[in-house]
Amino acid sequence: LEETEIIAESPFRKIKVKFKETVTLPRIIPREEIEKLLNHMYQCLNENDKASRKFMLRDVAVIEVFFATGARVYEISNIRDDSINLNTGLIRLMGKGGKERYVQISNTSILEVLKKYYDENEQSIKKSGYFFVNNRESRYTEQSIRLMLKKYTKQAGIERNITPHMFRHSFAT
């Protein structure tokens, strides 16, 4: 009507239309794959010799903390020795922008794994000041955690590329 000059201006010009964009949902780890990963890691833990047991305990503890807290890989890597209370299960995390927050682990079997890890690595933990340490007695870095996760998912026969952040999304659902 506007083009043929029957009306001066189309009334539709005053209507504002918003189209809702499709939102991609975050990727989560299916329960079966989490169970498969943890079962594999616990099996490896039971089969390891004493020398590698302390690092296997660390890896199991890291994965359990991921799933129990929904923490970011940066937050787990930077847990200080004095930021975790193994009796109460309270952990102080330093998040984005230096924001401090507390998370609670109430699962007693996870706390037992954390206590065993601490008992076998106490000297290295105290030396570094960080709760999760590498074989050189320093902080277990974010990149090392990512590589560890990749290694165990492959060993467990999981084809999906599982990232640390996927634990965060899985925790929230």
Task: Name every feature range the model reports, one short phrase each.
Residues 1-173:
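Conserved catalytic core of the tyrosine transesterase superfamily
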